[in-house]
Structure formats: structure tokens, C-alpha cells
């Protein structure tokens, strides 16, 4: 197997911005809010996309990309099928990690913490705000299960569309999760691979400890 350019030779010099303690927020949530809004303003493709890492009971990790749907002092929220692989792994081990990578801004945000389900009221409110096709899709897809072909999904969508018409209820197996952060890291690419990297660690009632890490 060969390619015109060696993968080992692919590299980029990061020179867009810097991340200094004096200019960063003392609260990581405020720093995240600033960076996310800057990614949106810069029209970064899907700035709300984040990688979610979970670990199974056999200690085997897995990742997938999900979309952030909200955040506040309580944590980071996304929605999914509770019976999916990630849902089953979170049921057995509630610790998880998230990562945002905004390539165009040469920035990465990493978040670690414990995950819990959001309330039924929150899940209901978000579910009913979704487009009709997406709500039907939550019923149609037995997420992470083996299926014989795409026709299974299309048949399920037709079946549930006919059953629920314009008012599908939220499936009991579908809803939201909230990761409650206890560790944040903000990475800003810099020249010569001497990147800026700030870590925030929760110190109980004392709040957040901000430290610079070597890249």
C-alpha cells in the first residue's frame, strides 16, 4: 500500500493563537463557552461535535462522535439510545471523557467526569423539539444491534411513522446524559510543537485548580 505523500511527512505549524493563564478564565466552563462561541463564529464545521469515550466492564474502551445539546454549571448534555453500546457501557461504568477538536482554530478541549441520565422532563422537552423524521428515527433504529440491511431501518421508519403519525412519543430507551466535569484540559497549538495546555481540576468546595501542563 502506498500513497503520493508519506503519512509520516504530514505536519503543520500551529501559529494562529496562544493560551495564557492571565488571559484565560478561572472557571473552565467560561473558558469553554468562549471557545465554543469562537468556533461557531469562525464557522468551524459542526463545532458542536464531540468524541465520547466510554469503557466496558472488560476495560475495553470505545469512542464515537455525538453532538452537544446543552451545557451549564451542572455539566455537558447529549442525547442517544440508552440501549446502544455507549448506553450499556455507561450503565456499568459511569466515568467517561469528551473531546472537542476545532481544527481550524488549532484547539482541543478535553473533559472528564461522571455521567448521569438527565430527567425525563428534560429528555421529553428535547425529544419533542426535534424534527419529525428524527423522532421517528429514534423508534426505527435498534442502535448498535446487527441488522440484515438498510431495508430494516426503512421498514421500521414506515411502520412507526404510520403508527404515530405526527405525534411520536419519546421512546423509553431514548434520552439524555449529562457528564459532570471534574477535569478539563484546553490545548492551543503553538509553533515548534511548544503548545499551550491548561488543566483545570475540581478541588471540591474550593473550586477549580488551574495548572499549565507540558505539551
Curated annotation (Swiss-Prot):
GO MF entries: FMN binding; pyridoxamine phosphate oxidase activity
Coiled coil: none
EC number annotated for this UniProt entry: 1.4.3.5
Cofactor(s) needed: FMN
Chain sites annotated for binding FMN: 64-69, 79-80, 85-86, 143-144, 187, 197
Cofactor binding, per record: Binds 1 FMN per subunit.
Pathway annotation from the record: Cofactor metabolism; pyridoxal 5'-phosphate salvage; pyridoxal 5'-phosphate from pyridoxamine 5'-phosphate: step 1/1; Cofactor metabolism; pyridoxal 5'-phosphate salvage; pyridoxal 5'-phosphate from pyridoxine 5'-phosphate: step 1/1
GO terms of biological process kind: pyridoxine biosynthetic process
Annotated keywords: Flavoprotein, FMN, Oxidoreductase, Pyridoxine biosynthesis
Any Pfam family the entry gives: PNP_phzG_C
Catalytic reaction list: pyridoxamine 5'-phosphate + O2 + H2O = pyridoxal 5'-phosphate + H2O2 + NH4(+); pyridoxine 5'-phosphate + O2 = pyridoxal 5'-phosphate + H2O2
Transmembrane segments: none
Domain of life, per lineage: Bacteria
InterPro entries, A to Z: Pyridox_Oxase, Pyridox_Oxase_N, Pyridoxamine_oxidase_dimer_C, Split_barrel_FMN-bd
UniProt keyword rRNA processing present: no
Positions bound to substrate: 11-14, 69, 126, 130, 134, 193-195
Function: Catalyzes the oxidation of either pyridoxine 5'-phosphate (PNP) or pyridoxamine 5'-phosphate (PMP) into pyridoxal 5'-phosphate (PLP).
Assembly notes: Homodimer.
PANTHER family documented for this protein: PYRIDOXINE-5'-PHOSPHATE OXIDASE, PYRIDOXINE-5-PHOSPHATE OXIDASE
Alphabetical list of HAMAP family matching this protein: PdxH
Family in the record: Belongs to the pyridoxamine 5'-phosphate oxidase family.
Protein name listed in UniProt: Pyridoxine/pyridoxamine 5'-phosphate oxidase
